[in-house]
Design a protein with these regions (language model features):
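C-terminal functional module detector
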Residues: 3-14, 22-29, 34-248
Length: 248
């Protein structure tokens, strides 16, 4: 497990302070770069989950540069409100992360041949049948305002897919060239069901072991940009953890 947003800094001077390795949209490069380190680990078949860090040393209102825990970045775990189930959800990737309360619920489900799997899980499909995989994305915006007094809106959701090819011979490899954004969705592509929004997409003829993951943003950026001095509240993103597809 590794962090996504590194601490949720209240001042973007700190968010972008990492020299040659700035954060992108509030997240470290390992998470934010499509085909980067996180995707390289997933491509090796590793169950490597991301979480958000929300530690706080000195709050920005007291001269520091931090938010309070959970004020800006949050980790959500799909679990019952029981200690052991929360820890089980963390261990097994039933997690999504968000900044600025862009969303308060995210469910990603892959289904095919009568089987289904969610974040952190694996769906197995047979080559003997048609290997289309149906993806359903459900997200819920906040009912009220976030800690900045805003009502953020999701402007785009991306579906990202990569191949699982097994351990790399190059132990320094930090890329997965098979990973790509395969579909982008805007407000015209989702429909409302109660308090949630639903997106459906079909991956045709998935012929090899793969994984899929989802991200979304409040911006119109095609990819997260390196953080500068802008307000972190104007550059919000969420990420799911992956669903794996095994082809047999």
């Amino acid at each position: 497990m590794r962090p996504g947003p590194p601490g949720g800094p209240a001042q973007r001077q700190r968010a972008g302070r990492y020299g040659n390795h700035p954060t992108y949209g509030g997240y470290d490069q390992a998470t934010a770069r499509v085909g980067g380190l996180w995707d390289a680990l997933l491509g090796e078949g590793r169950r490597w989950w991301i979480t958000a860090i929300s530690d706080s040393h000195v709050h920005w209102t007291r001269g520091g540069s931090d938010f309070r825990p959970g004020e800006y970045s949050k980790t959500y775990v799909l679990a019952r409100q029981e200690y052991h189930d929360i820890m089980d959800g963390l261990r097994h990737g039933r997690i999504f992360v968000t900044t600025g309360d862009l969303i308060t619920r995210l469910d990603v489900t892959a289904s095919g041949q009568g089987r289904a799997a969610g974040a952190g899980e694996t769906i197995t499909v047979s080559r003997r049948d048609r290997t289309d995989v149906d993806v359903e994305i459900r997200f819920r915006p906040p009912a009220g305002t976030n800690a900045n007094g805003d009502r953020p809106q999701v402007r785009r959701v991306d579906l990202i897919v990569g191949r699982v090819t097994g351990p790399s011979a190059d132990r320094d490899a930090d890329t997965n060239p098979t990973t790509a954004v395969v579909a982008r969705f805007g407000p015209r592509d989702w429909r409302q069901q109660g308090a949630q929004y639903v997106i459906r997409h079909t991956l045709r003829d998935v012929g090899a072991d793969s994984y899929l993951r989802v991200r979304g943003t409040s911006t119109d950026e095609a990819e997260p940009l390196a953080d500068g001095l802008e307000s972190p509240w104007s550059d919000l993103w969420f990420y799911s953890n992956p669903v794996f597809v095994r082809v047999r």
